[in-house]
Swiss-Prot record:
Pfam families documented for this protein: Maf
One of the GO biological process terms: nucleotide metabolic process
The protein's required cofactors: a divalent metal cation
Protein name: 7-methyl-GTP pyrophosphatase
Catalytic activity of the protein: N(7)-methyl-GTP + H2O = N(7)-methyl-GMP + diphosphate + H(+)
Family: Belongs to the Maf family. YceF subfamily.
The organism of origin for this protein: Pectobacterium atrosepticum (strain SCRI 1043 / ATCC BAA-672)
Keywords of the record: Cytoplasm, Hydrolase, Nucleotide metabolism
Residues the record marks as active site: D69 (proton acceptor)
Compartment(s) of residence: Cytoplasm
Length: 197
């Protein structure tokens, strides 16, 4: 069985991949994540997911390398990680009462055969109307500065929503496990039949 590499140091993605109970290692890809001029959200997350997976191929030459990246879109604007409270407050104010679309790019690169599978998995988040006090309270308690959209859906962020819409809730956290399982199966690796030694 080819070994699996997660091209990420995100504790959230690592925890998600652990759900599949397949052995893997994590490694940090070093890529430029700057969006290209005129690049839409779907093209951006697919390009970044593929770039992250391919970036590790020189060190992992006979592996299945998983790359993932996520952006959120409000209106026609791509919104990234807030990095601080001022930006997070602005993002949540803009999202209040609206639908925010998330796109998670997923790539599985077989470094031995040089074949790659990739998708952009959509997920919609419908925010309820939020008060300033709720936004402040949430940001104070959870400090989601590293999260696209300024929330952690796996934590207190769930209280910000009216409803969620998508085929895989793991997509919102950063790693679409349903799609990943399908990709792994195409490479001959089924998480349900892998023996962990």
């Amino acid at each position: 069985m080819q070994q699996i590499v997660l091209a990420s140091t995100s504790p959230y993605r690592k925890a998600l991949l652990e759900k599949l109970t397949v052995p893997f290692v994590c490694a940090s890809p070093d890529i430029d994540e700057t969006p290209r001029i005129g690049e839409n959200a779907i093209d951006l997350v697919i390009r970044l997911a593929e770039s992250k997976a391919r970036a590790l191929a020189t060190h992992y030459t006979n592996h299945l390398i998983i790359g993932s990246d996520q952006v959120c879109v409000l209106g026609n604007s791509i919104t990234g990680k807030p990095h601080n409270k001022i930006n997070a407050t602005r993002q949540l104010q803009q999202a209040s009462g609206k639908c925010v679309s998330f796109f998670t790019g997923l790539a599985l690169f077989n470094s031995a055969t040089q074949s790659i599978q990739s998708i952009a998995e959509p997920f919609d988040v419908y925010f309820r109307t939020l008060t300033e006090a709720e936004i402040d309270g949430y940001l104070e308690k959870e400090q989601p500065w590293n999260c696209a959209g300024s929330f952690k859906s796996e934590g207190l962020g769930i209280t910000l929503f009216e409803r969620l819409s998508g085929r895989d809730p793991n997509t919102l956290i950063g790693l679409p496990l349903i799609a990943l399982t399908q990709m792994l199966q195409k490479e001959g690796l089924n998480p349900l039949t892998v023996r962990n030694e």
